[in-house]
C-alpha cells in the first residue's frame, strides 16, 4: 500500500467479496506471486503497486513473467495529473519504465471513461499474447466516480463481451511431416514448451508409442 493507490485500495475494500486482495511485504513478491498464479492456473495474474519506488520493485517479477510467457497485468499508481512532469514526491516516468517489460501494452488512464476499455484491453492482450501488460492510474483519477460505460459519441472506445481463446491447428501436411520425422528417429527425445500446454495426455501417448523421453 501507499498513497499512490489509496483510491484503488478503498475500492478493493468495498469489493472484498468479489476480488481477493493479498497484501505482501514487498512489491517484488507481488509480481512473482502474480507470475506464479498465471503459471499454475493458466489465468491472468494481477499485481498492484504504488507509484515511484513501489512500481520499480515490480520489475524483477514482471520480467520473470515476460520471459516465461506468462499473462500478468500490473496496475500501478501515479501522482495526480496536475503534478505529472513536475518531479513531485518520488515521481517516476512510468511509461518509460514499463515500456520494455510491458511493451505489448502500457497505458495511463487519464479519465474514468477510459478505465473499462483500458483494463479490458490489458487483460485481453496479456492472455492472448501470453505477456505482461501495465495500466497506470494517477491517484486523483482513482478518486473520481466510475463511468460504467463510455458515452456513445465520436471518439469513445467501447469493449466487447467475453473472450474466445485462439486455437492453433497445424495443417495435415505439417502433421505428416512431423510423424515421418518421429517414425524415422532411432532415439527420440521430446522437448516440450508452452505449445504443449493442456496436452499432457497427448504428449504421454506419443512418448509411450515412441519410447521417448520427455523434458521441458
Language-model features: locations:
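N-terminal alpha/beta PP-like core and its mobile active-site loop of ThDP/TPP-dependent enzymes
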Residues: 1-216
Amino acid at each position: 500500500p501507499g498513497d499512490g493507490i489509496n483510491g484503488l485500495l478503498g475500492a478493493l475494500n468495498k469489493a472484498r467479496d468479489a476480488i481477493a486482495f493479498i497484501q505482501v511485504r514487498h512489491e517484488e513478491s507481488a509480481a512473482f506471486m502474480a507470475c506464479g498464479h498465471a503459471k499454475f492456473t493458466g489465468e491472468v495474474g494481477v499485481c498492484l503497486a504504488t507509484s515511484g519506488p513501489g512500481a520499480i520493485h515490480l520489475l524483477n517479477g514482471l520480467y520473470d513473467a515476460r520471459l516465461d510467457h506468462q499473462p500478468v497485468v500490473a496496475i500501478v499508481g501515479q501522482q495526480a495529473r496536475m503534478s505529472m512532469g513536475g518531479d513531485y514526491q518520488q515521481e517516476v516516468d512510468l511509461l518509460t519504465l514499463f515500456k520494455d517489460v510491458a511493451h505489448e501494452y502500457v497505458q495511463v488512464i487519464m479519465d474514468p471513461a477510459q478505465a473499462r476499455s483500458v483494463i479490458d484491453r490489458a487483460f485481453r492482450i496479456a492472455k492472448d499474447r501470453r505477456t505482461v501488460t501495465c495500466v497506470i492510474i494517477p491517484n486523483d483519477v482513482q478518486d473520481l466516480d466510475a463511468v460504467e460505460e463510455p458515452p456513445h459519441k465520436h471518439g469513445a472506445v467501447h469493449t466487447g463481451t467475453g473472450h474466445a481463446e485462439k486455437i492453433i491447428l497445424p495443417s495435415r501436411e505439417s502433421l505428416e511431416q512431423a510423424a515421418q520425422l518421429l517414425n524415422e528417429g532411432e532415439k527420440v527425445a521430446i522437448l516440450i514448451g508452452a505449445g504443449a500446454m493442456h496436452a499432457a495426455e497427448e504428449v504421454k501417448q506419443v512418448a509411450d508409442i515412441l519410447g521417448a523421453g520427455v523434458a521441458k
